[in-house]
Curated annotation (Swiss-Prot):
Name of the protein in question: Lipoprotein YlpA
InterPro entries linked to this entry: TraT_complement-R
Lipid linkage positions (S-diacylglycerol cysteine): 23
Gene: ylpA
UniProt function note: May function as a virulence determinant.
Localisation: Cell outer membrane
NCBIfam families: PRK13731.1
Range of residues in the leader sequence: 1-22
Keywords from the UniProt entry: Cell outer membrane, Lipoprotein, Membrane, Palmitate, Plasmid, Signal, Virulence
Source organism per UniProt: Yersinia enterocolitica
Length: 245
């Protein structure tokens, strides 16, 4: 009778873990089944209204991803706003320079500031399984086996349903031509060795106001692949850059 009670208790706990792990994975799959894209800009850029509609584009990519289609997308987005894209920097009223620094799978805490939900199921399974030891100290071997099994169940469920976030980080500089000369003071702190810095200053005269910002675009979906995320990340970046104009 006592042996049967142990078996029933172990079976009940393991069944609960199966249900909880399955529910956690299913909940993630349902909530994240559609691709969600978010784009944020670190600073707002205000440009003076102008009848000049010429833009020079310089698009770079120093990430490890191939983004040959990004420049054409930005060009089209700017043209759709009514601007003419020129290959001559001297003839352009605006310069738009952008560099993709990083495009990769990224933890949501790093990219969006909140904790990913993908690992809770496995941790819950392991914790519940280990708790069986307190039920009966005479069945340590059985408790350990169920604990490991419960943890593995949660891990397998989470491995099948993974909450994936891809993030693209881009630095953007926009230069706006002015009618009057501008004097710009540049200061650079160059690191010397492990504890020193060399400060360099220079002054230059030009005819452009310069503005800088950072664009962070994120795509989130269950079991997301970069091949699916890349087009929408590029579209969002192109839209954000064009909307500055």
């Amino acid at each position: 009778m006592k042996k049967n009670m142990k078996l029933i208790a172990i079976t009940a706990v393991l069944s609960s873990v199966l249900v909880l792990s399955g529910c956690g994975a299913m909940s993630t799959a349902i909530k994240k089944r559609n691709l969600e894209v978010k784009t944020q800009m670190s600073e707002t850029i205000w440009l003076e209204p102008s009848s000049q509609k010429t833009v020079y584009l310089q698009i770079k990519n120093t990430s490890d991803k191939n983004m040959l289609g990004l420049a054409p997308k930005i060009t089209k987005a700017v043209q759709d706003k009514g601007y003419t894209v020129t290959s001559s920097p001297e003839d352009a009223h605006y310069w738009i320079q952008a560099n993709v620094l990083k495009a990769d799978k990224m933890d949501l805490r790093e990219a969006e500031g909140f904790l990913s939900q993908g690992y809770q199921g496995a941790a819950l399974g392991a914790a519940l399984g280990a708790g069986i030891t307190g039920y009966n100290s005479n069945s340590a071997g059985a408790s350990l086996g169920v604990g490991l099994a419960a943890g593995l169940v949660g891990m397998v469920a989470d491995a099948m349903v993974e909450d994936i976030n891809y993030t693209m980080v881009t630095d953007v500089q926009i230069s706006e031509k002015t009618d009057t000369p501008l004097q710009t003071d540049n200061v650079a702190a160059l690191k010397q060795g492990t504890s020193g810095y060399k400060v360099q200053t220079s002054t230059q005269t030009g005819n452009k106001h310069q503005y800088q910002t950072r664009v962070v675009s994120s795509a989130n979906k269950v079991n997301l692949k970069f091949e699916e995320a890349q087009p929408v990340l590029e579209d969002q970046l192109a839209k954000s850059i064009a909307n500055i104009l």
